[in-house]
């Protein structure tokens, strides 16, 4: 309590592990997300908007109960009706649910969908790892064709290059299919039985031994050095599929390395699996990834159709750009900045700014009765190309002063001709 008897409140902060994006970084965030989505839309992917929470059973069935995501990291709670719901930890399961519910799998195939938004995982916050992560993702559903795998991977590569990122690398592997997995699973469990595993790791080995390979602890990686590899247990069809994918990537000029030990953290992946990594991010080096998920739709109650997709981290991409000493190109915030000198001028300026906006010109104006010098500084901070000034002299003459802030040139323009003049200068 304060001396006056009023309660003293603690400062409010965002929840732990959840970043705010405020200007100017928010402009970079928007630039990265927009660049990713533009690349997806240019490749024929249509936008899909999904709820941020779903029935918990969707993720338990779709992502896999043995995964860390489901067993440890989900934000799950009961709503007022007693139903168990979960803030979405990833995007693919929700997209597949929507495809089944709205019969998108019964139209033109492949169904090519793009999405963006926040996803939630209860992880230990650290550099590059947040509890609310921002992603852009795509899913291509309904066609089992290695050319589609190559398209999706090349699209992800193009997304990162579109923001000026170049210090990343692409890692690929094949996880085989339902005919390859049983023999490999048995071989891997046989190997794991010889290791001194802790109780939690033993549980994983019984439920899904591939999850053990995803253990990043140094002592576990050392013990797993001689573990059998999936690449040595691929069927002829899985091997041919993977070789076709890599050949197509080479034709497209997409560089890659094969990582036979890659295991992504979700159970639904089959055949092609990939990850983009950036060494400038330290331990949290993954900036995006994905893979094929044949069988997931049937597992969720739909048709037995294949699919492939990716999720790209907007947060991680921003950190990777920072590690390279770069920023995302945000463009000019406004084209025109209005500077009224006096109350009468302010009324006229407000009307002119509204007219410019209606004509599609990005425009803002100075508020608060600041002087000309301060208003010009505000125009420069807004990265405006043109400043429009109205004072007593301009009011009397029915004109405005238009100044090019890059060239330093200034012209008097009749109010009636302002929109046409501005458009001509911005063209």
UniProtKB/Swiss-Prot annotation:
Catalysed reactions, as listed in the record: tRNA(His) + L-histidine + ATP = L-histidyl-tRNA(His) + AMP + diphosphate + H(+)
GO biological-process terms attached to the record: histidyl-tRNA aminoacylation
Organism: Corynebacterium urealyticum (strain ATCC 43042 / DSM 7109)
Keywords for the protein's UniProt record, in alphabetical order: Aminoacyl-tRNA synthetase, ATP-binding, Cytoplasm, Ligase, Nucleotide-binding, Protein biosynthesis
Domain of life per record: Bacteria
Membership in a protein family: Belongs to the class-II aminoacyl-tRNA synthetase family.
Keyword Lipid metabolism belongs to the record: no
One Gene Ontology cellular component: cytoplasm
A Pfam family matched in the record: tRNA-synt_His
Localization (cell): Cytoplasm
EC numbers, comma separated: 6.1.1.21
Subunit and interaction comment: Homodimer.
GO molecular function per UniProt: ATP binding; histidine-tRNA ligase activity
Protein name: Histidine--tRNA ligase
PANTHER family, per database record: HISTIDINE--TRNA LIGASE, MITOCHONDRIAL-RELATED, HISTIDYL-TRNA SYNTHETASE
